[in-house]
Amino acid sequence: NEMYRVLKKDALMVSFYGWNRVDRFMAAWKNAGFSVVGHLVFTKTYTSKAAYVGYRHECAYILAKGRPALPQKPLPDVLGWKYSGNRHHPTEKPVTSLQPLIESFTHPNAIVLDPFAGSGSTCVAALQSGRRYIGIELLEQYHRAGQQRLAAVQRAMQQGAANDNW
């Protein structure tokens, strides 16, 4: 309910979910007032958590509050998920997978909220997309990793290109 409360009117939320809990997620989203307006599948080139099957995808629902404007360039419903090699967090999302979502579903200078920020991938993607961000993380080790990561990205963005003075 809190996500629905803080989300602006006529806005979208993207929620990643575990396939084995989709019924609980769906009930919670609908009880909060969200409408499900899309589903995304991210294909991986590697397998995670192989038990009965090796999982090579991640999924997310696109949820709406009100009637958000349609994106100028709609995304395909199947997107890539490139492993970055960064292991700041056990369920880290690649910035390259999050950035298209942010750029498609928000406008420049909008605020992107990640209430489960982990090591800050969503915040990095928002920053690199010209959006403001709020990241919330309860575990100190991931909060610290996220702060360090964002500071490094901000430093890199403030530095000029190597050929700026030519």
Model-derived features with residue positions:
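Core catalytic lobe of class I
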Residues: N1-R144
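S-adenosyl-L-methionine
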Residues: Q147-W166
